[in-house]
């Protein structure tokens, strides 16, 4: 997996500093942040390096069939933000929502907006 560009790393490091945490890249060049309310935010470079994948994983209070159905219904074009949302479940049962950002347009505002969008979508599950 390719590494982030210098600009993208600077955005992620600034984001982390604003949140009061240190940004440390994993071996696969991804970054992960754990938030008490929002869940686990992961920022991952795409295989082709053209996009940045932003994921938010949250362990649901209940993981029954109706909650899972609501999770998967969120997949597709989000009307509010006009971004394509991906939905899935992690091996630990966490609900995962993700979206792609164009690397060349990646900045603090787009990362903040991605976190807000994903958090609001998670909240809508119930």
Residue spans of the language-model regions?
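Conserved short hydrophobic interaction patches
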Residues: 18, 73-78, 114-125
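Short, charged/polar, Gly/Pro-enriched secondary-structure boundary elements
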Residues: 39-42, 104
């Amino acid at each position: 997996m390719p590494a982030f560009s210098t600009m993208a790393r600077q955005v992620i490091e600034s984001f982390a500093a604003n949140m009061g945490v240190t940004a440390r890249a994993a071996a696969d060049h991804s970054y992960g942040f754990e938030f008490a309310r929002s869940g686990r935010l992961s920022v991952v470079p795409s295989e082709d390096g053209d996009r940045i994948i932003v994921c938010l994983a949250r362990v649901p209070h209940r993981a029954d069939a109706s909650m899972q159905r609501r999770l998967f219904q969120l997949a597709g074009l989000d009307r509010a933000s006009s971004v394509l949302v991906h939905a899935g479940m992690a091996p630990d049962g966490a609900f995962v929502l993700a979206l792609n950002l164009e690397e060349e347009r990646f900045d603090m505002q787009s990362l903040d907006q991605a976190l807000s969008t994903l958090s609001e979508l998670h909240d809508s599950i119930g």
